[in-house]
Amino acid sequence: MSTNAIAVLRGDTVSGIIRFKQDKEGLPTTVTGEVKGLTPGLHGFHIHQYGDTTNGCISAGPHFNPYNKTHGDRTDEIRHVGDLGNIEAGADGTAHISISDQHIQLLGPNSIIGRSIVVHADQDDLGKGVGAKKDESLKTGNAGARVACGIVAIGAAS
């Protein structure tokens, strides 16, 4: 039996619903959903450490990084567990999400249930920033302000 989770994203002008599904511990987790109200283009998309939104999305803390690695792309070998790359909003401000990720888990000791998912204002540079932006790139991907977030909660069986 698979495990399901859901996050309802809220921000000043951005909202969405993200669903997670994992069939068995150690297998990839599928992430699907829709985010509305974004500016057209790419936006950083990450799992953050805490499921705390008491002070808006800033309370979510840093990217979920249980192995103490540097920031990277979703497909990179070296990355935070919470690094999910970018989502792309079309001209209507809507991003449709459909990914499978081996690193985020709903089951086991590094489960993302109870943590938060955050959409950022800017494109994530995927840890490839240079010059004055390099240090921040290796932590956050220079993805900018947090425009929406939600807590990853246990979802109903599908």
UniProtKB/Swiss-Prot annotation:
<keyword id="KW-0049">Antioxidant</keyword>
<dbReference type="InterPro" id="IPR024134">
    <property type="entry name" value="SOD_Cu/Zn_/chaperone"/>
</dbReference>
<feature type="disulfide bond">
    <location>
        <begin position="57"/>
        <end position="149"/>
    </location>
</feature>
<feature type="binding site">
    <location>
        <position position="48"/>
    </location>
    <ligand>
        <name>Cu cation</name>
    </ligand>
</feature>
<dbReference type="InterPro" id="IPR001424">
    <property type="entry name" value="SOD_Cu_Zn_dom"/>
</dbReference>
<keyword id="KW-0963">Cytoplasm</keyword>
<keyword id="KW-0862">Zinc</keyword>
<protein>
    <recommendedName>
        <fullName>Superoxide dismutase [Cu-Zn]</fullName>
        <ecNumber>1.15.1.1</ecNumber>
    </recommendedName>
</protein>
<keyword id="KW-0479">Metal-binding</keyword>
<feature type="binding site">
    <location>
        <position position="71"/>
    </location>
    <ligand>
        <name>Zn(2+)</name>
    </ligand>
</feature>
<dbReference type="GO" id="GO:0005507">
    <property type="term" value="F:copper ion binding"/>
</dbReference>
<feature type="binding site">
    <location>
        <position position="63"/>
    </location>
    <ligand>
        <name>Zn(2+)</name>
    </ligand>
</feature>
<keyword id="KW-0186">Copper</keyword>
<dbReference type="Pfam" id="PF00080">
    <property type="entry name" value="Sod_Cu"/>
</dbReference>
<feature type="binding site">
    <location>
        <position position="120"/>
    </location>
    <ligand>
        <name>Cu cation</name>
    </ligand>
</feature>
<dbReference type="GO" id="GO:0005737">
    <property type="term" value="C:cytoplasm"/>
</dbReference>
<keyword id="KW-1015">Disulfide bond</keyword>
<feature type="binding site">
    <location>
        <position position="83"/>
    </location>
    <ligand>
        <name>Zn(2+)</name>
    </ligand>
</feature>
<feature type="binding site">
    <location>
        <position position="63"/>
    </location>
    <ligand>
        <name>Cu cation</name>
    </ligand>
</feature>
<dbReference type="InterPro" id="IPR036423">
    <property type="entry name" value="SOD-like_Cu/Zn_dom_sf"/>
</dbReference>
<dbReference type="GO" id="GO:0004784">
    <property type="term" value="F:superoxide dismutase activity"/>
</dbReference>
<keyword id="KW-0560">Oxidoreductase</keyword>
<comment type="function">
    <text>Destroys radicals which are normally produced within the cells and which are toxic to biological systems.</text>
</comment>
<dbReference type="InterPro" id="IPR018152">
    <property type="entry name" value="SOD_Cu/Zn_BS"/>
</dbReference>
<comment type="similarity">
    <text>Belongs to the Cu-Zn superoxide dismutase family.</text>
</comment>
<comment type="subunit">
    <text>Homodimer.</text>
</comment>
<feature type="binding site">
    <location>
        <position position="80"/>
    </location>
    <ligand>
        <name>Zn(2+)</name>
    </ligand>
</feature>
<feature type="binding site">
    <location>
        <position position="46"/>
    </location>
    <ligand>
        <name>Cu cation</name>
    </ligand>
</feature>
